[in-house]
Amino acid sequence: DMDDFGLGDFDDGR
């Protein structure tokens, strides 16, 4: 989980 977008665990598979 990278909080690069500040979405928390949203960009897990992105």
From Swiss-Prot:
Tissues in which the protein is found: Nacreous layer of shell.
Domain of life: Eukaryota
Protein name stated in the entry: Uncharacterized protein IMPP20
Species in which this protein is naturally found: Nautilus macromphalus (Bellybutton nautilus)
